[in-house]
C-alpha cells in the first residue's frame, strides 16, 4: 500500500504570480510507515511545500520509467532523503540519511555520500500503484489550488505538463 495525504493552507498575502496553496501538510504512508505531518489544525510551523513534494514525486515517477534509482531530498531537513529503487515492477522505498554535497539537487539518480539506512528500509509497492497514487493526488492538488489562483499560473502548468508526460 502507498498513500499520499495533503492539506493546503490558503495564503492571502501571496504575490499575483506566486502559487496560493503551495504550503500545507504533506504525508505519505507505505507499509504502516509514515513520513510527514498531517494533523487537523493548521499550524504554520509544521507546514511544508506540498507543491514541491508533489513535483519531486512526479519527477521520480518519470525517472523511474527508465532508471532504477532515485533519491528525493527532504528540503526541510539537512540530511534526510527518500530512496526509491525500482526492480522490475516493484518499488522499494526507504527513509535514509546521507550527506547533501555542494551542488547536489533535490532529486538525484545516484547514491549520496555516507548513505545510511537509519530508519525504515525497502518498503515495497508496485511501480504502477505508486505512479497512480502520485498522479491522482497531483491532479487533486491541482483542482484545489486552481480555485485559489490565476488559471495560467506557471506552477500549476508545470505540474500538469509532468502529468501529461507520465500519462503520454
Task: Mark where each language-model region is.
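N-terminal low-complexity, intrinsically disordered segments
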Residues: 1-76
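Hydrophobic beta-strand residues in large extracellular and virion-surface proteins
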Residues: 4-6, 28, 82-84, 91-93
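Secondary-structure transition/turn motif
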Residues: 30-33, 94-102
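A residue-identity detector for tryptophan
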Residues: 52-53, 81, 120
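Enriched - but not universal
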Residues: 55-56, 84, 123
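Short, structured protein-protein interaction patches enriched in aromatics and acidic/basic residues
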Residues: 71-91
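Mixed-charge, glycine-accented linear interaction segment located at domain edges/termini
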Residues: 103-168
Amino acid at each position: 500500500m502507498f498513500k499520499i495525504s495533503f492539506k493546503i493552507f490558503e495564503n492571502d498575502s501571496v504575490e499575483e504570480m506566486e502559487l496560493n496553496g503551495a504550503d500545507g501538510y504533506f504525508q505519505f504512508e507505505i507499509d504502516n510507515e509514515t513520513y510527514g505531518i498531517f494533523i487537523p489544525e493548521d499550524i504554520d510551523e509544521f507546514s511544508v511545500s506540498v507543491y514541491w513534494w508533489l513535483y519531486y514525486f512526479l519527477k521520480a515517477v518519470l525517472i523511474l520509467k527508465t532508471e532504477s534509482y532515485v533519491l528525493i531530498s527532504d528540503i526541510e531537513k539537512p540530511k534526510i532523503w527518500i530512496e526509491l529503487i525500482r526492480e522490475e515492477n516493484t518499488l522499494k522505498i526507504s527513509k535514509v540519511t546521507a550527506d547533501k554535497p555542494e551542488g547536489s539537487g533535490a532529486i538525484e539518480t545516484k547514491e549520496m555520500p555516507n548513505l545510511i539506512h537509519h530508519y525504515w528500509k525497502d518498503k515495497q509497492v508496485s511501480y504502477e500503484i505508486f505512479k497512480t497514487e502520485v498522479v491522482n493526488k497531483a491532479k487533486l492538488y491541482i483542482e484545489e489550488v486552481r480555485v485559489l489562483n490565476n488559471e495560467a499560473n506557471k506552477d500549476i502548468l508545470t505540474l500538469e505538463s509532468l502529468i501529461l508526460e507520465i500519462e503520454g
